[in-house]
């Protein structure tokens, strides 16, 4: 029995209970129930049962009933659900459910029949989502903040897709502007053997790219004026840098569907269309020769200039055009991942969304990520050999590899600053979280291989034999996985999946470590193969499948052996 099965059965019972109360004259005509009104949770104390619900306490006031009495009514009916061993009232109105071993164990078959689809759902079935992340201008290698967004963004895309969304991964960039000018001047200075400009970019990569630009130029660079030389380095240098960024991200397992150039907003007329639309909606005014958007009407702390008095578009005009462009492309939900230094942008962007007539935090969601630090020998790593003063994605991957890097960056909430301990991630021990999970998966494959050699197969399945406390706990962890994936999608929190498979790995290791033989998949010595061994193989393989599914959602490999 899956949580969804129990939830559906409980929903039917609660609906019937409410209908009975209506029939006896209770004034609950406006009470419309959905499955979400009938929640199931894992009890913190497993001694209380397999599942718990506070549905009676949630509905008692609306139903005009005493919570414990309503809970008792629901529990009495729920005790008759196929696969439920008991339903008991606890405390002020909780209902605790215990499942029969056969019903709980049936999950192993369900998982193996579903395979890679176990954990997927239809929460966002068909929803068109634009997920914009990384979006670093091509002035240098991807820094640690961008690396975090690469791992988190790609994982979130996978999780949203698992819940049925049609996700477009998008990278927004600009190869003009002041940052690019500084980059071009830095390249030119390196080529000419001059000191790095005071506001320029340093690091070994500048010299590398400058040399490539010079080597690839079909002509005599020295014959050009300094301004023309700088334009050569700007154009060719940014192209080389951007290709390097794409290549590094690809090696990190992150690819984008769309690379959106800021200049196209003006070339396509998107900015002008956005301003015209907002004017038609009555949110534009002119003052001191400038064009303003009245964002204070939508909660912003001040109105925003969108066209300066000299006719030049202000920075926010690009945001207006870009958002409208996404909506015109059909995206119903737009997610933008920004660094902590962009926190002040949230108010104005949400006001912009509302000015267009859309819904903040629905049509546009903004995720803010905190800083990332690398730590080695207990001290922060402050310098990159290649990039100078910034520490990069390459530095992290070179130290610990792609899998450990991705897992380390995705397993913590983006709301918190992250210290990545390189020494820990290099360890082949249970202290290392990615090793812990990957080793659990590899162990499931090793057990399966050894079982085959010992003549244990899945020709029999008797889930009622899965009665050991570690088996009940492991089945509980497996049951939780689809719910965790749905929550991760709904809350845009991929770390929930990582933490879930860490917990599952722990439950599996505990099951494997039982020493009295009561959970063994492979018979000892001359012991004959029994249906208990065969059934445990189902549980072993189901665990491997879920670990594999979870690792795939966070973009980490599931090794067959370690």
From Swiss-Prot:
GO molecular function (one): ATP binding
The name this protein goes by in its record: Arginine--tRNA ligase
Any one GO BP annotation for this protein: arginyl-tRNA aminoacylation
PROSITE patterns: AA_TRNA_LIGASE_I
Organism ancestry: Bacteria, Bacillati, Actinomycetota, Actinomycetes, Micrococcales
CDD domains from the UniProt entry: ArgRS_core
Keywords assigned by UniProt, alphabetized: Aminoacyl-tRNA synthetase, ATP-binding, Cytoplasm, Ligase, Nucleotide-binding, Protein biosynthesis
InterPro entries documented for this protein: aa-tRNA-synth_I_CS (IPR001412), Arg-tRNA-ligase (IPR001278), Arg-tRNA-synth_N (IPR005148), Arg-tRNA-synth_N_sf (IPR036695), ArgRS_core (IPR035684), DALR_anticod-bd (IPR008909), Rossmann-like_a/b/a_fold (IPR014729), tRNAsynth_Ia_anticodon-bd (IPR009080)
SMART domains: Arg_tRNA_synt_N (SM01016), DALR_1 (SM00836)
EC number(s) on file: 6.1.1.19
Subunit structure: Monomer.
Record keyword Cell cycle present: no
Catalysed reaction, written as an equation: tRNA(Arg) + L-arginine + ATP = L-arginyl-tRNA(Arg) + AMP + diphosphate
Organism: Leifsonia xyli subsp. xyli (strain CTCB07)
Motif ('HIGH' region): 136-146
Family membership: Belongs to the class-I aminoacyl-tRNA synthetase family.
EC top class named in words: ligase
Assigned GO CC terms: cytoplasm
Gene3D superfamilies: Arginyl tRNA synthetase N-terminal domain, HUPs, Isoleucyl-tRNA Synthetase, Domain 1
Main location: cytoplasm
Protein's cellular compartments: Cytoplasm
């Amino acid at each position: 029995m899956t949580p969804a099965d129990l939830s559906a059965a409980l929903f039917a019972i609660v609906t019937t209970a409410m209908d009975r109360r209506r029939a006896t004259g209770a004034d609950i005509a406006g009470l419309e129930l959905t499955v979400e009104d009938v929640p199931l949770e894992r009890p913190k104390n497993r001694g209380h049962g397999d599942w718990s619900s506070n549905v009676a306490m949630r509905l008692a006031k609306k139903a005009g009933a005493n919570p414990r009495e309503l809970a008792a009514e629901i529990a009495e009916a729920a005790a008759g659900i196929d696969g439920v061993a008991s339903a008991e009232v606890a405390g002020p109105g909780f209902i605790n459910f215990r499942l029969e071993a056969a019903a709980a164990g049936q999950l192993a078959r369900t998982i193996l029949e579903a395979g890679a689809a176990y954990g997927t759902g239809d929460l966002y079935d068909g929803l068109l989502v634009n997920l914009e992340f990384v979006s670093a201008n091509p002035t240098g290698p991807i820094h640690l903040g961008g690396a975090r967004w690469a791992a988190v963004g790609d994982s979130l895309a996978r999780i949203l897709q698992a819940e049925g969304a049609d996700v477009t991964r998008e990278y927004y960039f600009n190869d003009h502007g002041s940052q690019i000018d500084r980059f071009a001047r830095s390249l030119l200075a390196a080529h000419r053997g001059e000191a790095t400009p005071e506001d320029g970019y340093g690091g070994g990569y500048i010299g590398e790219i400058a040399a490539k630009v010079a080597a690839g130029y079909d002509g005599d660079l020295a014959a050009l004026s300094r301004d023309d030389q700088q334009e050569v380095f700007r154009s060719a240098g940014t192209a080389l840098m951007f290709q390097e960024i794409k290549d590094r991200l690809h090696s990190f397992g992150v690819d984008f569907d769309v690379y959106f150039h800021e200049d196209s907003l003006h070339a396509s007329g998107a900015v002008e269309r956005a301003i015209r639309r907002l004017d038609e909606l009555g949110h534009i005014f002119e003052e001191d020769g400038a064009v303003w958007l009245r964002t204070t009407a939508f909660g912003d702390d001040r109105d925003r200039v969108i066209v300066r008095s000299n006719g030049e578009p202000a920075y926010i005009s690009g945001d207006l055009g870009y958002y409208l462009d996404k909506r015109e492309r059909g995206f119903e939900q737009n997610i933008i991942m920004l660094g902590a230094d962009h926190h002040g942008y949230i108010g104005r962007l949400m006001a912009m969304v509302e000015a267009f007539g859309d819904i903040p935090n629905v049509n546009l969601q903004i995720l803010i990520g905190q800083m990332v630090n690398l730590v080695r020998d207990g001290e922060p790593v402050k310098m990159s050999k290649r990039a100078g003063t910034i520490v990069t994605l390459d530095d992290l991957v070179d130290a610990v590899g792609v899998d450990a890097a991705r897992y380390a960056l995705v397993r913590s909430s983006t709301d918190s600053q992250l210290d990545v301990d390189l020494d820990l991630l290099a360890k082949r021990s249970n202290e290392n979280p990615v090793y812990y999970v990957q080793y659990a998966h590899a162990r499931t494959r090793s057990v399966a291989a050894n079982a085959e050699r010992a003549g244990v197969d899945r020709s029999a399945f008797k889930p009622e034999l899965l009665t050991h406390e570690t088996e009940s706990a492991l089945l509980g962890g497996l049951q939780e996985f689809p719910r965790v994936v749905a929550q991760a999608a709904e809350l845009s929190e991929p770390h929930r999946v990582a933490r879930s498979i860490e917990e599952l790995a722990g439950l599996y290791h505990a099951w494997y470590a039982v020493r009295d033989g009561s959970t063994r998949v492979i018979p000892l010595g001359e012991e004959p193969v029994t249906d208990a061994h065969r059934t445990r193989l189902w549980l072993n393989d189901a665990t491997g499948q879920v670990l594999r599914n979870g690792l795939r959602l966070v973009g980490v490999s599931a090794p067959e052996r370690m």
